[in-house]
Design a protein with these regions (language model features):
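Short glycine-enriched loops at secondary-structure junctions
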Residues: 107, 134-136, 183-184
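Nucleotide 5′-phosphate-binding alpha/beta core
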Residues: 1-89, 94-112, 119-120, 125
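Acidic/glycine-enriched edge-of-secondary-structure segments
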Residues: 95-109, 145-154, 175-179
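Active-site glycine/GP-rich loop and adjacent strand/helix microenvironment
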Residues: 2-14, 18-31, 35, 151-352
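Short, solvent-exposed beta-strand edge segments and adjacent coil->beta transition regions
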Residues: 97, 128, 327-329
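Generic structural marker for isolated residues within well-ordered, non-membrane alpha-helices
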Residues: 37, 87, 114, 145, ...
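Conserved ATP-dependent adenylate/AMP-binding module captured primarily in the ANL superfamily
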Residues: 111-128, 162-175
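Conserved AMP-binding loop of ANL adenylate-forming enzymes
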Residues: 119-155
Length: 352
């Protein structure tokens, strides 16, 4: 199932033209409304008129997490306060939280891309869906919530906590879909078993998991213990929240909503753009965001990008599984090692 075939199945030439137009509009918008970007572009001797197509994105400056912290709370905001209708924030555990303002159009885009994700997973308006991410400043809860409503399914805003009650609701209400972190899904499975229930006692069939790293081994365990199909859901608070990319039934990478979020892969060392298929740092430009648009935001996430039409019918670029972060890589005897690889090995050991 495809929510928006006009965008998700767009030809590459049409997508290139759309992205080019949106990038031109974005650059003009931030140049005139965000002093941070205007100063950066002037220092690089780049005028908005120099950006003629999406291919010119390499001329533009990067944005980093530190830039967001240095401009706390609202210096990167492009829309006037009167147009900001909601604010979310990151945890800020290592400094100032990242404050992200959303306009009404931003929220409409967010619910649209989340509806694409849920439809790709197989959720329909006939489903009852539990949103078990945290609500509040964290983007997970409300992001998934309004996507479910946009799709037309019934949303149960369970959030987190009181897991036994949650399981009873899943059983009694016939909840068929759930969005939560993969670690909470495993805790749900553990609690289900402690309550003396089996996976056959509940009706979960689809799970959307994200907001933290997880492995293929975790996917297999979640599917086996909860009796559902587990899908990856990717997003960042700085970019939008959940809904930036999503797996389809083929589960061969995650489709990026690239009409709204333009992806690049760069070398963390040289900052040069890398070709499709090469592993590097994932970078996003928010092509349509009004509240706090970002140019070439360095996510620090390491993955690959995969072009080409998918067997599901979608034509959007896919991103591979996140293998680690450019800021947590260890070099052991000349080999790059990521914590996620260690976790994968540990999970294969039965005693764990």
């Amino acid at each position: 199932m495809i929510w928006n075939p006009n965008k998700e199945c767009m030809s590459r030439d049409e997508m290139h033209a759309l992205q080019s137009k949106r990038l031109q509009n974005l650059v003009t918008y931030v140049y005139h409304n965000v002093p941070f970007y205007r100063n950066k572009m002037q220092a690089m001797d780049i005028a908005p008129e120099a950006i003629e197509s999406i291919d010119d994105i390499v001329k533009l400056p990067f944005t980093t997490k530190q830039d967001l912290r240095d401009n706390y709370p609202y210096s990167l905001q492009a829309a006037p306060p009167s147009e900001i209708v909601r604010v979310h924030a990151s945890s800020g555990t290592t400094g100032n939280p990242t404050i992200v303002g959303y306009t009404r159009k931003d929220l409409a885009v967010w619910s649209e891309v989340m509806a694409r994700c849920l439809t790709a997973y197989g959720i329909t308006r006939d489903d009852t869906f539990s949103v078990s991410y945290g609500y509040g400043l964290f983007t997970g809860g409300l992001g998934a919530h309004y996507g479910v409503e946009n799709l037309g399914a019934t949303v149960i805003p369970t959030s987190t906590g009181n897991t036994e009650k949650h399981i009873r609701l899943i059983r009694d209400l016939g909840i068929s879909g759930i969005a939560c972190t993969p670690s909470y899904a495993l805790y749900l499975a553990e609690t289900l078993e402690k309550m003396g229930l089996k996976r056959e006692d509940i009706s979960l069939r689809i799970g959307a998991f994200g907001a933290e790293p997880w492995t293929e081994n975790m996917r297999k365990e979640i599917e086996e213990r909860l009796g559902l199909k587990a899908y990856n859901l990717y997003g960042l608070s700085e970019i939008m929240g959940p809904g930036v990319s999503y797996e389809c039934s083929e589960q061969n990478g995650s489709h990026i909503c690239e009409d709204h979020f333009y992806p690049e892969i760069i070398s963390p060392d040289t900052l040069e753009q890398l070709p499709y298929g090469e592993q590097g740092e994932l970078v996003f430009t928010t092509l349509t965001k009004e509240g706090m648009p970002l140019l070439r935001y360095r996510t620090k996430d390491l993955c690959t990008l995969m072009p080409g039409e998918c067997a599901c019918g979608r034509t959007t670029v896919r991103m591979g599984r996140i293998v680690g972060r450019s800021d947590d890589m260890l070099i052991i005897r000349g080999i790059n090692v990521f914590p996620s690889q260690v976790e994968s090995v540990i999970l294969e050991m039965q005693e764990f």
